[in-house]
């Protein structure tokens, strides 16, 4: 994320994304949500240095489909696309199965929301 292009994120989203970006001097560009607070995936088909999307979005709780995320990932094959699934257990569809298909897709999760394990650090990995 250290190139001249900016990473893209929705303008209404998890509040720490911009904080962490500033902390590490990563430039960001916020993409406005539509009037109904949904993400227009076409807005993420522009030059960028990466994308981060909470799905379902925090705080709107609106999710985009696996197919829409796959379109974003395909269109940005030379850039990392991070999908934050902190709230996926409350609604939405996981895109974890897509990580086998796309090297540029990173899915992050937390156990603090749906499992009430805030503060516990757990690492899950594939044994292969």
Regions found by a protein language model. Name each.
Residues 91, 101-128:
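Active-site PLP attachment segment
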Residues 12, 85-87, 110-111:
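Short strand-turn motif at the edge of the Rossmann-like AdoMet-binding core
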Residues 16-23, 124:
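Hydrophobic alpha-helical segments in the ANL/AMP-binding
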Residues 7, 81, 105-107:
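Hydrophobic/aromatic residues located in beta-strands of well-ordered beta-sheets
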Residues 2, 72-77, 99-102:
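Short, conserved loop/helix-junction motifs that constitute active-site signature segments
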Residues 1-6, 24:
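Phosphate-binding glycine-rich loop
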Residues 11, 30-35, 109:
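Short beta->alpha connector loops at strand-helix junctions that form conserved
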Residues 34-85, 89:
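Active-site phosphate-binding strand-loop segment of PLP-dependent enzymes
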């Amino acid at each position: 994320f250290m190139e001249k292009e900016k990473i893209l994120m929705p303008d209404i989203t998890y509040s720490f994304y911009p904080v962490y970006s500033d902390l590490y001097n990563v430039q960001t560009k916020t993409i406005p949500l539509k009037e109904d607070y949904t993400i227009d995936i076409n807005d993420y088909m522009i030059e960028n240095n990466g994308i981060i999307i909470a799905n379902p979005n925090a705080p709107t709780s609106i999710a985009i489909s696996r197919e829409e995320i796959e379109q974003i990932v395909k269109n940005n094959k030379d850039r990392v696309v991070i999908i934050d699934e902190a709230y996926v257990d409350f609604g939405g569809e996981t895109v974890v199965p897509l990580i086998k298909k796309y090297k540029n897709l990173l899915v992050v999760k937390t156990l603090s929301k749906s499992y009430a394990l805030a503060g516990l650090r757990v690492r899950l990995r594939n044994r292969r």
